[in-house]
């Protein structure tokens, strides 16, 4: 399967089911009471991290995801069924961004972790809810709300315990193959590895017997000078380094390893300065190609850079057991690492817009008389409430008027200068303003 670590998708949660406007019907009962049931909740879109998946490629053929609508309520107080949620299974290490706002809406760093990225609509209430001492037979019900829709950008930052970083042809793939069960492409030319490759490294005792301890190791494609600016494979794979718990700088002893280490650290610093805070060591590779005295001299020079240095030969197997055991000892505790490296997910709150009241004068219908005084109401959540009763506005007018009064709309209109008999307009709903305090 091809490797893909960025994907744009569209998600649409299910709409809430409408409440029912119904009255009890039975033999010998001419006027039964209201018995409309509530609508069901719309299904949500849920992102879920699963193991065994290391790419977003499996989602390419399906870019749009829709959850099930809630079912409408029915008579006899029967509530509509909730819509079924839709799960999108992604690799551990997937971050979801809202494309329009750029906000982080999910960051999944553990197997089984879930996050709702599009919330299902609310079910509407049936007419049985709206009875009162003065309203014993309400002929209206509440409609369900639309499900949330959004465009989402998925970015995968592979969560590997150890990340191998180095220049092309430094021997990272050979080292990964020698330490783990991975089978990367290996050749004597740069950029053999064109996507991150994961392998599992097993701990062994002194006799070479496998123990019940392991970690994952990632071969990050070769970095070149200017990678942080997009050169070579550039930014395409630098993001994966940010998810590793420990970095191993793989350096070729036959080149200029001190200079290459400094250049690698400069590229990481330019991309994300916090990467240099990771636990790290140097694997000085291909020592079989030089005299031991020269290899030791290079090791001493590298040690002056402040990192532990181990001489290894991926080809001959020299130093691999020491490197493996050192990595097990250096790896920080996973739970502490996960807590400190997860991105902060911004709360997905819905905030009503501030109330705005705008006055206008409309010409009289027949061109005679005084202009009609109209007060437009925007925000404050009032328009959304109108939409929920749009099918029953005439019958729900009294209920809505009392609701708006309790919520302070009449006081706001009075302060704005509304007079008795003026028209109030909220979306498509129009009613006459009545000031009962005059």
Curated annotation (Swiss-Prot):
Its cofactor is Mg(2+). Its main location: cytoplasm. GO terms for biological process: ribosome biogenesis. It comes from the Bacteria. Residues 1-159 form the Obg domain. Coiled coil: none annotated. InterPro entries: G_OBG, GTP-bd, GTP-bd_Obg/CgtA, GTP-bd_prot_GTP1/OBG_C_sf, GTP1-OBG_CS, GTP1_OBG_dom, GTP1_OBG_dom_sf, OBG_GTPase. Belongs to the TRAFAC class OBG-HflX-like GTPase superfamily. OBG GTPase family. An essential GTPase which binds GTP, GDP and possibly (p)ppGpp with moderate affinity, with high nucleotide exchange rates and a fairly low GTP hydrolysis rate. Plays a role in control of the cell cycle, stress response, ribosome biogenesis and in those bacteria that undergo differentiation, in morphogenesis control. This is GTPase Obg.
């Amino acid at each position: 399967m091809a490797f893909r670590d960025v994907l744009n998708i569209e998600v649409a949660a299910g709409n809430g089911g409408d409440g029912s406007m119904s009255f009890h019907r039975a033999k010998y009962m001419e006027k039964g009471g209201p018995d409309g049931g509530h609508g069901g909740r719309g299904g949500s879109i849920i992102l879920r991290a699963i193991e065994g998946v290391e790419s977003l490629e499996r989602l390419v053929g399906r870019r749009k995801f829709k959850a099930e609508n809630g079912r409408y309520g029915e008579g006899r107080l029967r509530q509509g069924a909730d819509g079924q949620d839709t799960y999108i299974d992604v690799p551990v290490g997937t971050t979801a961004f809202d494309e329009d706002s750029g906000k982080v809406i999910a960051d999944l760093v553990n197997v089984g972790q879930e996050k709702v990225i599009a919330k299902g609509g609310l079910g509407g209430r049936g007419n049985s809810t709206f009875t009162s001492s003065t309203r014993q037979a309400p002929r209206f019900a509440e409609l369900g709300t639309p499900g949330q829709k959004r465009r989402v950008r998925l970015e995968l930052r592979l969560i590997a315990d150890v990340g191998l970083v180095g220049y092309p042809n430094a021997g990272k793939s050979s080292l990964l193959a020698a330490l783990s069960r991975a089978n990367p492409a290996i050749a004597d030319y740069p950029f053999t590895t064109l996507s991150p490759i994961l392998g599992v490294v097993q701990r062994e005792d002194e006799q070479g017997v496998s123990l019940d301890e392991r970690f994952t190791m990632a071969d990050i494609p070769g970095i070149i000078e200017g990678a942080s600016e997009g050169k070579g494979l550039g930014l395409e794979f630098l993001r994966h380094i940010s998810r590793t718990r420990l970095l191993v700088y793989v350096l070729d002893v036959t080149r200029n390893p001190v200079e290459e280490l400094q250049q690698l650290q400069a590229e990481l610093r330019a991309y994300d300065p916090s990467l240099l805070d990771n636990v790290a060591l140097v694997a000085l590779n291909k020592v079989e190609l030089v005299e031991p005295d020269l290899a030791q001299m290079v090791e001493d020079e590298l040690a002056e850079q402040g990192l532990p240095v181990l001489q290894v030969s991926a080809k001959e197997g020299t130093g691999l057991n020491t490197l493996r055991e050192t990595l097990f000892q250096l790896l920080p505790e996973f739970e502490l690492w996960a807590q400190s490296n997860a991105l902060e997910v911004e709360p997905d709150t819905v905030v009503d817009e501030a109330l705005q009241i705008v006055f206008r004068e409309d010409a009289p219908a027949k061109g005679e008389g005084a202009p009609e005084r109209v007060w437009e109401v925007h925000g404050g959540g009032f328009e959304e409430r109108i939409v929920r009763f749009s099918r029953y506005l005439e019958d729900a007018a009294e209920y809505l008027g009392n609701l708006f009064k309790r919520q302070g709309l009449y006081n706001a209109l009075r302060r704005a200068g509304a007079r008795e008999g003026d028209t109030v307009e909220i979306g498509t709903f129009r009613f006459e303003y009545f000031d009962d305090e005059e």
